[in-house]
Amino acid sequence: MGSRSSTRIPVPLMLTVRIMLALSCVCPTSSLDGRPLAAAGIVVTGDKAVNIYTSSQTGSIIIKLLPNMPKDKEACAKAPLEAYNRTLTTLLTPLGDSIRRIQESVTTSGGGKQGRLIGAIIGGVALGVATAAQITAASALIQANQNAANILRLKESIAATNEAVHEVTDGLSQLAVAVGKMQQFVNDQFNKTAQELDCIKITQQVGVELNLYLTELTTVFGPQITSPALTQLTIQALYNLAGGNMDYLLTKLGVGNNQLSSLIGSGLITGNPILYDSQTQLLGIQVTLPSVGNLNNMRATYLETLSVSTTKGFASALVPKVVTQVGSVIEELDTSYCIETDLDLYCTRIVTFPMSPGIYSCLSGNTSACMYSKTEGALTTPYMTLKGSVIANCKMTTCRCADPPGIISQNYGEAVSLIDRQSCNILSLDGITLRLSGEFDATYQKNISIQDSQVIVTGNLDISTELGNVNNSISNALDKLEESNSKLDKVNVKLTSTSALITYIFLTVISLVCGILSLVLACYLMYKQKAQQKTLLWLGNNTLDQMRATTKM
């Protein structure tokens, strides 16, 4: 059966590819429009590109601490170099010992491997407590053990070279770059100049430069006396050690210039010491940086709320701090899995939450759907700058314009005031003077009022007050109920017994029957009386007619 080749993609990378493919099917997004929201106290402060980073890639940088002097100048620089060499050994020997203890704690036998590793870590940590980060750093140090051993095999050739930067590839499993900040100085100052320098000047120049570099080394490794091998080095520390030569390694690892500044600010580029050789004064550091995937159709929009005026007092809008928009979909973005820089978000995973229809409608520009909470105090800063203009609550503070002079008043019912250079060039707020350079064009909505129905109670103190009012209402109701019970208690219970009720019902029925019979009898008697009256009237009329007839005869 023939062999079958297969390509296995790491799960995080597959997740990244799927997300990017899914988002590529959605129409490109536009930034959340903050113009209709500004007058409602909701300010869009900026956008950041969303990136997802997965498993890290590594490379080694071998720092050559001791420079090689030109043959004709070795004698002049001998004294400062020897003093520098002794100081280096004193400073970095604890680091080398710590690295060796951790690397030697793990052998090929499986039984007590983990126990020996933890024991070695705790042995090099103050107070005998190993953090998760230190255990992770120790594990990375163990994984780099073979690479460090391969570098040490080449230490003589690395130490002998006069090149400031060169790649080391022989027998190494990952990219390694040997750099020498001091070698760069020697090459620039002595090897590439035709100017003859006297021995005293050479000694002074070398001594000063070596002292400066020792200061940088002390800054990098000084705070790590307790566990020097287990503390990560920041990108700033790496640049202090390697100088500008650090860029060479990062470029070789695939970091572009457009990405470099953002990654440096993120703190995702770190280093861990993996070897120190006092004989050749070589320091090996494994540099770790992330694999970054850019989500082209996704950006994070940051929202800030301003305390606005309402008929119920000062309130702030209930909206998420960060939202993301892809096409027509707007959702809240959880940034707890992300690292922020000035322009980018680097996330290990993308987590969003759907918003209620009211908040969605609010952020889409329907400010009448926005809800507000009475949680902002009177000491909250009542203004915010936006693109050279100011959004201020001029009911909470005095908006004094110095050019042209005057007081900017806020109309009754208006949430906030939008102030730009068209209305004021120099604005004073709480003693702070601002020169305005921006404008709110006609697309910005103004004179927005917050209705009473839009203000709800969410703060602890306000809820306590409302609960107090509810408790008072309940107490009043209980008082009324108690008063009613006292009146009911005065009722004769004997009159409300079952037998008494039956008697009352029976007598009531008899009374009703008697009443009906009396009514029928009365009607009959009235009818009979009227009949008798008609008979008597007829007899009278008949007798009168007979008398008239007799008289005529």
UniProtKB/Swiss-Prot annotation:
Residues 32-500 are extracellular. Glycans are attached at N85, N191, N366, N447, N471. Residues 117-141 are annotated as: Fusion peptide. The record marks R116, L117 as: Cleavage. Residues 522-553 are cytoplasmic. The inactive precursor F0 is glycosylated and proteolytically cleaved into F1 and F2 to be functionally active. The cleavage is mediated by cellular proteases during the transport and maturation of the polypeptide. It is found in: Virion membrane; Host cell membrane. GO terms for biological process: fusion of virus membrane with host plasma membrane; symbiont entry into host cell. It is a single-pass type I membrane protein; Single-pass membrane protein. Keywords: Coiled coil, Disulfide bond, Fusion of virus membrane with host cell membrane, Fusion of virus membrane with host membrane, Glycoprotein, Host cell membrane, Host membrane, Lipoprotein, Membrane, Palmitate, Signal, Transmembrane, Transmembrane helix, Viral envelope protein, Viral penetration into host cytoplasm, Virion, Virus entry into host cell. A lipid is attached at C523 (S-palmitoyl cysteine). Disulfide bonds join C76-C199, C338-C347, C362-C370, C394-C399, C401-C424. Residues 1-31 form the signal peptide. The chain crosses the membrane at residues 501-521. One of its GO terms (cellular component) is virion membrane. Residues 142-170, 466-491 form a coiled coil. Belongs to the paramyxoviruses fusion glycoprotein family. Class I viral fusion protein. Under the current model, the protein has at least 3 conformational states: pre-fusion native state, pre-hairpin intermediate state, and post-fusion hairpin state. During viral and plasma cell membrane fusion, the heptad repeat (HR) regions assume a trimer-of-hairpins structure, positioning the fusion peptide in close proximity to the C-terminal region of the ectodomain. The formation of this structure appears to drive apposition and subsequent fusion of viral and plasma cell membranes. Homotrimer of disulfide-linked F1-F2. This is Fusion glycoprotein F0. It comes from Newcastle disease virus (strain D26/76) (NDV). The lineage of its organism: Viruses, Riboviria, Orthornavirae, Negarnaviricota, Haploviricotina.
